[in-house]
């Protein structure tokens, strides 16, 4: 295998136009036997693989696709059987679970594709797809245990971030505002809390012992049976938008589940509202008590009278713990958490700007950075800080305090206002911000690892949706967006592999983007579903009757009104650009061959031009007054014709005189010397 890869890489540089077809013929008995044995063992040796590969030269892309296909099946490619002894085999129980709709196999643990990537040539390439695939191949796939470990890190990071938010008085202030909005009816409960998580209670987030291994295995088998049953009922053919729902259900079942979901949300909201309102009221009452102690603490630090008494400190800690417990029990909506984090970061940014301004001012007088930080930290709210720095003997301090006293007081007043706004000391605020940033950073890093390890899954799904109006890179991008949503929603305690769960999110993201972006004139998703249903049925009937079905036959087959079928078929037609090149030389466009109903035929245009020229010559043979009267009466060379009265006003004569001039001019035109020139136009 290694020799074949090297030979094919050299051959690839000589012929760029090689075709990329599948290397393994899955209908061949030898290939079937090899794959069956490899699935049972979890690996295949290179010698075994070489024995079933075709003898003709192939491209490195074909070998890469073959390695990826085997990896998707859960088969590792190794040099020899001795190398497999060090690597644990995949659990057989996950192999069925990895299979998704349409017979597609989702990636599982293994490093086959990463091994294949190492065998690729290291020459530079400008192709963005190849660069993306090469970078993607450097990340190893995750096993089930690896997915659980990363999911736990995401959960721990989120827990750290929420714990930090729960210690911020800004969170309690926001909760009180949200409670008032709920009472006023301006906000829905589902916009503030995560209904499903709050409804399921602590058991939903508890340790795995709340779900026994037997329960997890039973759920997994039930899901597999449901998937197999659905796949048997599904029609054959390409996958369409109608095949993919939010939960991987057929359209009919998905619609029913959507109704049930909407009903359940309303029911959960009605059931949880009293409990949530009671919790919010408790938070409001407890926070009022805590706020009094916080104000006393800040005032004590500003007045340099020390801190709270031991009893007050103990009471402060008790109230704080009660608030944190109450807030965590709410399971806030992610959008609300993001708004709280953004508010916290905004105040932190303003604090850093003021402190940075003060530091730069001190450094301009020669104060060393370390010396400034030593004197400043811990004394942010000390009203006697100006006096203390004036007495310092270190370089620059006295000049700094003397020359910039007004600016220093102004900056420190702004910092004090921020402390009052947050309700806690600056040091405590910094600790909370650091805690939130740490949790957010850990969760983000873990999510990034999970996403990068499953990029192959997006590629394998996106390949099925090419030639549908979007570029391959656009499909990958939309699939990656779905993958990131799947990472956010993944619940590892349910016992399923991440690939099984993420497949539906990726497919829905891709199919929805095709429906929204692929057409020049956007068609609603529900109409796209109807179009795909008719197209699929038409393709099926084509195989049955040997010709394209008529609209009447489609309407009868689908039990649809004939007018609706005709309307859908009309909408389904793709628009084509009038600038489409025509011919080999591409010197003309499609629009050049479309008849313009409003344009004159060339012969008619020539006749009209000749008539205009002849009429002008004939009229010129009359007197100027007669010519002008005829032109005005018949609108020749003018925007409109004129009445006898209007012409008379122009010449300051009566209408009767104009009638006489007109009659005389017409008699002159009827003379054979003039009428002969115009009679030919009348005959034509």
Swiss-Prot record:
Residues 644-663 bind DNA. Residues 83-102, 250-261 have a biased composition (Acidic residues). Residues 529-605 are annotated as: Sigma-70 factor domain-3. Keywords: Cytoplasm, DNA-binding, Sigma factor, Transcription, Transcription regulation. GO terms for biological process: DNA-templated transcription initiation. Interacts transiently with the RNA polymerase catalytic core. This is RNA polymerase sigma factor RpoD. It comes from Agrobacterium fabrum (strain C58 / ATCC 33970) (Agrobacterium tumefaciens (strain C58)). The gene is rpoD.
């Amino acid at each position: 295998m290694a020799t074949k890869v090297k030979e094919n890489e050299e051959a690839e540089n000589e012929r760029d136009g090689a075709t990329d077809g599948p290397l393994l013929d899955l209908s061949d008995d030898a290939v079937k036997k090899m794959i069956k044995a490899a699935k049972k063992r979890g690996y295949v040796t290179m010698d075994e693989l070489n024995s079933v590969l075709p003898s003709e030269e192939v491209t490195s892309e074909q070998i890469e696709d073959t390695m990826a296909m085997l990896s998707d099946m859960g088969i590792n490619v190794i040099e020899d059987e001795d190398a497999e002894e060090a690597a644990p085999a995949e659990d057989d129980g996950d192999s069925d679970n990895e299979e998704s709709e349409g017979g597609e196999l989702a990636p599982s643990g293994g490093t086959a594709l990463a091994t294949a990537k190492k065998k690729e040539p290291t020459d530079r390439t400008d192709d963005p797809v190849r660069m993306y695939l090469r970078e993607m191949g450097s990340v190893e796939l995750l096993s089930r245990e690896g997915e659980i470990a990363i999911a736990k890190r995401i959960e721990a990071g989120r827990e750290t971030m929420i714990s930090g938010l729960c210690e911020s008085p800004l969170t309690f202030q926001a909760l009180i505002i949200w409670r008032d909005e709920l009472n006023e009816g301006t906000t829905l409960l589902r916009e503030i809390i995560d209904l499903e998580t709050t409804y399921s209670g602590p058991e939903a987030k508890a340790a795995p012992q709340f779900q026994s291994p037997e329960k997890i295995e039973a759920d997994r088998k039930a899901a597999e049976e449901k998937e197999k049953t659905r796949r048997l009922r599904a029609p054959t053919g390409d996958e369409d938008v109608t095949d993919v729902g939010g939960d991987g259900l057929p359209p009919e079942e998905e619609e029913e589940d959507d109704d049930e979901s909407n009903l359940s949300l309303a029911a959960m909201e009605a059931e949880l509202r009293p409990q949530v309102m009671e919790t919010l009221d408790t938070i409001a009452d407890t926070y009022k008590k805590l706020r009094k102690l916080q104000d006393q603490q800040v005032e004590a630090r500003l007045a340099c009278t020390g801190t709270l008494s031991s009893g007050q400190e103990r009471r402060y800690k008790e109230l704080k713990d009660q608030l944190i417990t109450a807030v965590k029990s709410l399971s806030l909506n992610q959008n609300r958490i993001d708004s709280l984090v953004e508010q916290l970061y905004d105040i932190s940014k303003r604090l850093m700007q003021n402190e940075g301004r003060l530091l730069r001012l001190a450094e301009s007088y020669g104060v060393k950075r370390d010396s400034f930080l030593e004197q400043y930290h811990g004394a942010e709210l000390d009203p006697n800080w100006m006096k203390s720095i004036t007495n310092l003997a270190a370089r620059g301090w006295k000049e700094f305090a003397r020359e910039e006293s007004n600016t220093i007081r102004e900056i420190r007043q702004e910092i004090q206002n921020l402390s009052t706004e947050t309700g806690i000391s600056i040091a405590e605020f910094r600790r909370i911000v650091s805690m939130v940033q740490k949790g957010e950073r850990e969760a983000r890093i873990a999510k990034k690892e999970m996403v990068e390890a499953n990029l192959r899954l997006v590629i394998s799904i996106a390949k099925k949706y090419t030639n549908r109006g979007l570029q391959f890179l656009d499909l990958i991008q939309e699939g990656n967006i779905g993958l990131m949503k799947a990472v956010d929603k993944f619940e590892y305690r349910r016992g399923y592999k991440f690939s099984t769960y993420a497949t539906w999110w990726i497919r829905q993201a891709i199919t929805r983007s095709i429906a929204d972006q692929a057409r020049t004139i956007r068609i609603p998703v529900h109409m796209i579903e109807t179009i795909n249903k008719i197209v699929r049925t038409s393709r099926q009937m084509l195989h049955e009757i040997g010709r394209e079905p008529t609209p009447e036959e489609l309407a009868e087959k689908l039990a649809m009104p004939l007018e609706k079928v005709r309307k859908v078929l009309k909408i389904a037609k793709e628009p084509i650009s009038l600038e489409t090149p025509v011919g080999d030389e591409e010197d003309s466009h499609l629009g050049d061959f479309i008849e313009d109903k409003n344009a004159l035929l060339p012969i008619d245009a020539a006749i009209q031009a000749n008539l205009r020229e002849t009429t002008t010559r004939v009229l010129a043979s009359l007197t100027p007054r007669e010519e002008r009267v005829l032109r005005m009466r018949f609108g020749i060379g003018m925007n409109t014709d004129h009445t006898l009265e209007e012409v008379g006003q122009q010449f300051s004569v009566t209408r009767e005189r104009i009638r006489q001039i007109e009659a005389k001019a017409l008699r002159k035109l009827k003379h054979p010397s003039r009428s002969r020139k115009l009679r030919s136009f009348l005959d034509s």
